[in-house]
From Swiss-Prot:
GO molecular function, one term: metal ion binding
Cofactor binding: number and manner: Binds 1 divalent metal cation per subunit. Can use either Co(2+) or Zn(2+).
Lineage, top ranks: Bacteria, Bacillati, Cyanobacteriota, Cyanophyceae, Nostocales
Pathway named in the protein's UniProt entry: Metabolic intermediate biosynthesis; chorismate biosynthesis; chorismate from D-erythrose 4-phosphate and phosphoenolpyruvate: step 2/7
Broad class of the protein's primary localization: cytoplasm
CDD domains listed in its UniProt record: DHQS (cd08195)
PANTHER family xref list: 3-DEHYDROQUINATE SYNTHASE, 3-DEHYDROQUINATE SYNTHASE, CHLOROPLASTIC
A Pfam family the protein falls into: DHQS_C
Name this polypeptide is given: 3-dehydroquinate synthase
Residues involved in NAD(+) binding: 107-111, 131-132, 144, 153
Any one of the GO CC terms: cytoplasm
Keywords: Amino-acid biosynthesis, Aromatic amino acid biosynthesis, Cobalt, Cytoplasm, Lyase, Metal-binding, NAD, Nucleotide-binding, Zinc
Species in which this protein is naturally found: Nostoc sp. (strain PCC 7120 / SAG 25.82 / UTEX 2576)
InterPro entries according to UniProt: Dehydroquinate_synthase, DHQ_synth_AroB, DHQ_synth_fam, DHQS/DOIS_N, DHQS_C
List of residues binding Zn(2+): 186, 251, 268
Gene from which the chain derives: aroB
Length: 363
C-alpha cells in the first residue's frame, strides 16, 4: 500500500511517496513530473551494487537518458571536492536546466546531490530516493543540502527542495544494523519535539535496535509519522526562520561531537542521540523539563542501541568551542532546542557555557 504525504510550500510543493517495492517504478514516477530527459543518478558503490541497475533500467524504460556516478561512502567525503566531481560529470553529460539529479543513497549522498543540483546552472531538478532510515525520515525531506567544512558540519549549503521523494521501506532490509540504529535517533527526536503519540508507540515496542524485532505496523508508523512531522514543520517554515529550528534538537552538541571526531568515530544518528541526552539534561537543570521525561527519552535512546555517553577522552572544552561555529548561533549566542514536555520544545539562547559544561562532565 502506498502512503502519500504532501509537503506544502509557497514556492514548490511536492509529494513523499512511501511504497513497498517501488524502486522499479522510479522511472514511471518521474515521467509524471514532466522533467527534462537527461538524468544523473548519484549513489555510492554499495548502494549502486544493490539497487543501481533496477533504478537505471526503470528510468531508461520511461524514456530518460541516464548517466550514473558513484561517490565514496561516508561523512568525511561530504566535501567541495566531491561536489566538483559531480559538476564534472554534469558537464560531460551536458545537463541542462530541465535535467534532474537523482540521489539514490543515504543522507550524505542526498545532501551532496541536492547541493550540486542547487548550484549547477543556478539550480536544476533533484529527486530524493533515500536508502537509509535516517535519510527516509529526515534528510531527504525539506530541501536542506550542503557539505562540510573542516571546521564544522554543513557550513556550506543551500535550500533546494526536491521535486519528489520516493521511499521504498523494503530497502531497509538491506541496511546494516548500525545504520538502522542511527536512523532511529531521528525518529525518537520527532517523538520528543512534535509527536507524543509516536513517542508512546516507540515506548511500547520491546526492542528498537533491529528492524526484524519491530512489528510491521510500527515500522509503517515510524516512516509515515516521522515524514508527516517533518512535512508539517517544513510546510510552516521552509527556510528555518523560526519553527524549523526545532528539528535541530540534539544536533547542537551532536554536530560538535561529530566535528571533533573528524566524522570517523560516530554515525550522525549516534552523535544526535548523545546530543539529545545532553540537551534533555540541560532542560532539566534549567527546570524546563521533568527528570522523569528525560529518563524516558534516554531509555528509548538506549533501547535503540544508541550511545548516551560522550566518547572516552573527548575534550569538553573543545566541544564548547566548536558550538560557537554552529549554524544556529545568533549574535554570538548558541541557540539550543530544549524540551518542555514530550512532544513540545522551545528554542532558547540562555544556555551558558557553564550549563553545557556541567552536563557534559557527567557524560
Amino acid at each position: 500500500m502506498t502512503s502519500v504525504i504532501n509537503v506544502n510550500l509557497p514556492t514548490q510543493s511536492y509529494e513523499i511517496a512511501i511504497a513497498p517495492a517501488s524502486l522499479d517504478q522510479i522511472g514511471q514516477s518521474l515521467a509524471g513530473l514532466k522533467l527534462g530527459k537527461k538524468v544523473l543518478l548519484v549513489s555510492n558503490p554499495t548502494i549502486f551494487k544493490h539497487f543501481g541497475k533496477v533504478a537505471v533500467d526503470s528510468l531508461e524504460a520511461a524514456g530518460f537518458q541516464v548517466a550514473s556516478y558513484s561517490l565514496p561512502a561516508g561523512e568525511r567525503y561530504k566535501t567541495l571536492n566531491s561536489i566538483q566531481k559531480l559538476y564534472d560529470i554534469a558537464l560531460e553529460n551536458r545537463l541542462e536546466r530541465s535535467s534532474t539529479m537523482v540521489a539514490l543513497g543515504g543522507g550524505v549522498i542526498g545532501d551532496m546531490t541536492g547541493f550540486a543540483a542547487a548550484t549547477w546552472l543556478r539550480g536544476i531538478n533533484v529527486v530524493q530516493v533515500p536508502t537509509t532510515l535516517l535519510a527516509m525520515v529526515d534528510s531527504a525531506i525539506g530541501g536542506k543540502t550542503g557539505v562540510n567544512h573542516p571546521h564544522g558540519k554543513n557550513l556550506i549549503g543551500a535550500f533546494h527542495q526536491p521535486r519528489f521523494v520516493l521511499i521504498d521501506p523494503q530497502v531497509l532490509k538491506t541496511l546494516p544494523v548500525r545504520e538502522f540504529r542511527a536512523g532511529m535517533a531521528e525518529v525518537i527526536k520527532y517523538g520528543v519535539i512534535w509527536d507524543a503519540e509516536l513517542f508512546n508507540q516507540l515506548e511500547q515496542s520491546k526492542r528498537l535496535d533491529q528492524l526484524r524485532y519491530i512489528k510491521p505496523e510500527l515500522v509503517d508508523a515510524i516512516l509515515t509519522r516521522s515524514c508527516q512531522a517533518k512535512a508539517d514543520v517544513v510546510g510552516k517554515d521552509e527556510k528555518e526562520g523560526g519553527l524549523r529550528a526545532i528539528l535541530n534538537y540534539g544536533h547542537t552538541v551532536g554536530h560538535a561531537v561529530e566535528s571533533l571526531t573528524n566524522y570517523r568515530l560516530l554515525k550522525h544518528g549516534e552523535a544526535v542521540g548523545i546530543g539529545m541526552v545532553a540537551a534533555g539534561q540541560i532542560a532539566v537543570n534549567l527546570e524546563l523539563w521533568q527528570q522523569a521525561d528525560a529518563d524516558r527519552q534516554n531509555a528509548l535512546i538506549e533501547k535503540a542501541g544508541l550511545p548516551t555517553k560522550l566518547p572516552v577522552g573527548l575534550d569538553i572544552e573543545g566541544i564548547i568551542e566548536a558550538l560557537q561555529l554552529d549554524k544556529k548561533v545568533k549574535d554570538g549566542k548558541v541557540r539550543f532546542v530544549l524540551p518542555t514536555q514530550i512532544g513540545v520544545v522551545t528554542v532558547t539562547d540562555e544556555v551558558t557555557s557553564d550549563h553545557i559544561r556541567q552536563v557534559l562532565q557527567q557524560m
